[in-house]
């Protein structure tokens, strides 16, 4: 599949404006196709980014702690079904084996996956598996809590529904004690 030109993308925006009953040649909408294309370039900038490069800077130290947890990483993504936003928080825990990464690296990988068309379930797995694959910890736990515009702006019109997804690897998947501790910590907010 070849990537459309910028002009083809702008024409697609004009077509959508006509589809909803608007006149793309009216004053307020003249620059909208450019703005949409620029916005999409930023919003969907997660494509082509390499998570392994982000998690490549590791600190190899004797770990004097059992596990590492980063709570409340805020994100906004777009559902691949309706191209409507969903936003929420990501909680990530891992039990290091012999290395750790700076906390900003975890927030960066959340942003990489959030800046793609997504479904929350897949994003949860992608974050957990990328940490597992690149850091090789004893286990990883990821929880995403999000509100979906596709439920609040259309269809069932439920604006207070929060979807929670979790994915576990290693000792979090194998030992209930670790899952229980993670869920207790993430619930206390």
Swiss-Prot record:
Keyword match Secreted: no
Binding-site residues, Zn(2+): 79, 82, 150
Gene Ontology BP, a term: tetrahydrobiopterin biosynthetic process
Entry's Gene Ontology cellular component terms: cytoplasm
Alphabetized GO MF terms: GTP binding; GTP cyclohydrolase I activity; zinc ion binding
Subunit structure: Toroid-shaped homodecamer, composed of two pentamers of five dimers.
Family note: Belongs to the GTP cyclohydrolase I family.
Name the record gives this protein: GTP cyclohydrolase 1
Lineage of the species this protein comes from: Bacteria, Pseudomonadati, Pseudomonadota, Alphaproteobacteria, Rickettsiales
């Amino acid at each position: 599949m070849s990537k459309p030109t910028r002009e083809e993308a702008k024409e697609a925006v004009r077509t959508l404006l006509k589809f909803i009953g608007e006149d793309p040649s009216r004053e307020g909408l003249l620059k909208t196709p450019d703005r949409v294309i620029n916005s999409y370039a930023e919003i969907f900038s997660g494509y082509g980014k390499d998570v392994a490069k982000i998690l490549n800077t590791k600190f190899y130290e004797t770990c004097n702690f059992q596990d590492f947890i980063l709570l409340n990483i805020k994100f906004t993504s777009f559902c691949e079904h309706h191209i409507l936003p969903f936003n929420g928080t990501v909680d990530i825990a891992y039990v290091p084996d012999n290395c750790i990464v700076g906390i900003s690296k975890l927030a960066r990988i959340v942003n990489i996956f959030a800046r793609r068309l997504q479904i929350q379930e897949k994003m949860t797995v992608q974050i957990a598996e990328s940490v597992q694959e690149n850091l090789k910890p004893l286990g990883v736990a990821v929880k995403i809590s999000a509100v979906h515009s596709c439920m609040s702006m259309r269809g069932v019109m439920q604006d207070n529904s929060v979807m929670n997804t979790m994915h576990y690897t290693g000792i979090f998947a194998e030992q209930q004690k670790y899952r229980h501790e993670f869920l207790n910590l993430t619930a206390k907010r």
